[in-house]
UniProtKB/Swiss-Prot annotation:
Belongs to the VPS37 family. Pfam families: Mod_r. Component of the ESCRT-I complex (endosomal sorting complex required for transport I) which consists of TSG101, VPS28, a VPS37 protein (VPS37A to -D) and MVB12A or MVB12B in a 1:1:1:1 stoichiometry. Interacts with TSG101, VPS28, MVB12A and MVB12B. Component of the ESCRT-I complex (endosomal sorting complex required for transport I) which consists of TSG101, VPS28, a VPS37 protein (VPS37A to -D) and UBAP1 in a 1:1:1:1 stoichiometry. Interacts with HGS and STAM2. Interacts with CEP55. Signal peptide: none annotated. Residues 159-355 are annotated as: Disordered. GO terms for biological process: macroautophagy; multivesicular body assembly; protein targeting to membrane; protein targeting to vacuole; ubiquitin-dependent protein catabolic process via the multivesicular body sorting pathway; viral budding via host ESCRT complex. Keywords: Endosome, Membrane, Phosphoprotein, Protein transport, Transport. This is Vacuolar protein sorting-associated protein 37C. Residues 246-257 have a biased composition (Low complexity). Residues 170-186, 194-205, 321-355 have a biased composition (Pro residues). It is found in: Late endosome membrane. GO terms for cellular component: ESCRT I complex; late endosome membrane. The keyword ATP-binding does not apply.
Length: 355
């Protein structure tokens, strides 16, 4: 196009009428020159590749002939393998336990028949004694050996059949349960391990299994009288059904060398019957049937109450929901009254200087 740009209109008209000039102009264009160069380069490349392929022609022919030979050898090996396989099947069919059992049974019956025929001939006198002894013993031995082999082979044949029958009668194994998919948002549930049984009870008891009084301080000298500690404890006990027996009230301590007397005792409390003494009546009978002599202090067979029990009490058990509550107002289990002195009244007779 650059060559046509500089030409005049007259030159262009002449060029249009000249076909040779147009062809020359097309061949001199750069596009056609590039295509021609690419064509020559492709031809040179193809020529070099063809020459290289011709160099591999000899090894290719040799490899092809080797492949043909190997294929022929393979066919021969396949035919030989088929022949060996047929022989193996023939031998294996002849050596099957069932086939061997049949052959042994036939041979056993045959040798047994021959031994019986030998015995009959010997009985008829056709066979001499020496020949009979030599042949009959060997025949019977062979017959017994074959019989034992037949029995053992029968056991071998029966075992696989029994195992197959048991396997056929057994139910098919159950498939494992399908695994449930766990949602991604839900954390995996951890199975709680069972707790071992503990030695402590599941509910704390309000009392000890071995009740005992707390250890106090060591006493030196005379012990002062002191009542038991008072613990408030509601109870369902409504009091004694029979008449109560008041405790004997200790009187003032006598002087040294003087014994106790009824005149020195304190008068009984109002509302309770006084303790019978020697002045008012006979004493309480003892276990042996002997009554105490009048003039000695009489001790009540029941411990002194004074509104407090003579032993430490336990706190009340906790109430559970649904437990029936008592409708009767709670009453103390002992009649009210002043606390008696600690222990029993002092013994009669001369007082011990340690008190």
């Amino acid at each position: 196009m650059e060559t046509l740009k500089d030409k005049t209109l007259q030159e262009l008209e002449e060029l249009q009428n000249d076909s040779e000039a147009i062809d020359q102009l097309a061949l001199e264009s750069p596009e056609v020159q590039d295509l021609q160069l690419e064509r020559e380069m492709a031809l040179a490349t193809n020529r070099s590749l063809a020459e290289r392929n011709l160099e591999f022609q000899g090894p290719l022919e040799i490899s092809r002939s080797n492949l043909s030979d190997k294929y022929q050898e393979l066919r021969k090996l396949v035919e030989r393998c088929q022949e060996q396989k047929a022989k193996l099947e023939k031998f294996s069919s002849a050596l099957q336990p069932g086939t061997l059992l049949d052959l042994l049974q036939v041979e056993g019956m045959k040798i047994e028949g021959e031994s019986e025929a030998m015995a009959e001939k010997f009985l008829e006198g056709e066979v001499p004694l020496e020949t009979f002894l030599e042949n009959f013993s060997s025949m019977r031995m062979l017959s017994h050996l074959r019989r034992v082999r037949v029995e053992k082979l029968q056991e071998v044949v029966r075992k696989p059949r029994a195992s197959q029958e048991l396997a056929g009668d057994a139910p098919p194994p159950r498939p494992p349960p399908p695994v449930r998919p766990v949602p991604q948002g839900t954390p995996p549930v951890v199975e709680e391990q069972p707790q071992p049984p503990s030695a402590m009870p599941p509910y704390p008891l309000p009392y000890s299994l071995s009740p005992s009084l707390p250890v106090g301080s060591t006493a030196h000298g005379a012990l002062p009288p002191a009542p038991f500690p008072v613990v408030s404890q509601p109870s369902f006990y409504s009091g004694p059904l029979g008449p109560t027996y008041p405790a004997a009230q200790p009187g003032p301590r006598g002087a040294a060398g003087y014994s106790w007397s009824p005149q020195r005792s304190t008068p009984p409390r109002p509302g309770y019957p006084g303790t019978p003494t020697g002045a008012s009546g006979p004493g309480y009978p003892l276990a042996g049937g002997r009554a105490l002599s009048p003039g000695y202090p009489q001790q009540s067979p029941y411990p002194a109450t004074g509104g407090k029990p003579p032993y430490p009490i336990q706190p009340q058990l906790p109430s559970f929901p649904g437990q029936p509550q008592p409708s009767v107002p709670l009453q103390p289990p002992y009649p009210p009254g002043p606390a008696p002195p600690y222990g029993f009244p002092p013994p009669p007779g001369p007082a011990w200087p340690g008190y």
